[in-house]
Structure formats: C-alpha cells, structure tokens
Design a protein with these regions (language model features):
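Rossmann-like NAD(P)-binding element
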Residues: 53-89
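NAD(P)+-binding Rossmann beta1-loop-alpha1 motif at the extreme N-terminus of oxidoreductases
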Residues: 1-53
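Short beta->alpha hinge that forms the Motif I/post-I loop of the SAM-binding pocket
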Residues: 33, 66, 91-93
Length: 93
C-alpha cells in the first residue's frame, strides 16, 4: 500500500510511525512545508520517500495532517491530483 502523509508534525508523524505496525509492507511518502521536518522524518525512518504533488495520484491513501488555516490552501492541490480510488482523510484540530 502506498500512503501519502501531508504534514509531518505531531499528528502526521505519529500516524507515519504507527501505520507500519499493521501494514509493515506499506511505503510511506511524506510532504511538509518545513524542509527540516521532512528531512528529520526521513532520517528517523518515519517516511520512506518525499511526496510530490504530482505523485499523489499514485497513493492508495492520503492523510492530510495540517493546521486548519492551511487546509484551504493545499486541499485543492491534493484533490486536483488524487486518483479515483484514493482515500483522502483529514485529521486536524
């Protein structure tokens, strides 16, 4: 399963860490506005690869874990490229 996580903060990072337990063969892709967060997530093994918007259509699941004030900015980009069978989930507070 290919999983894309948009937002690698507390919620997105925690999901990335825990999803490997029930789905050990999943491949996790991550996207974050902060290059530092992205590099740290790769370094810690939370994600396997960096996610590009152009690759979102290849994901089976996209988890959007960004603050609500960024949601209106990035959600159209995600929905414009998402595959027909891709599940998109927003987790935010």
């Amino acid at each position: 399963m290919k999983i894309g996580i948009v937002g690698l903060g507390l919620m997105g990072g925690s999901f990335a860490l825990d999803i490997k337990i029930p789905y050990p063969n999943s491949v996790i892709y991550g996207l974050d506005m902060s290059k530092e967060n992205l590099n740290k997530a790769i370094e810690l093994g939370l994600i396997d690869h960096q996610l590009e918007y152009s690759k979102i259509s290849e994901m089976d699941l996209v988890l959007v874990a960004v603050p609500v004030n960024y949601l209106l900015e990035i959600l159209p980009k995600i929905l414009d490229t998402v595959g027909q069978k891709t599940l998109v989930i927003y987790v935010g507070s």
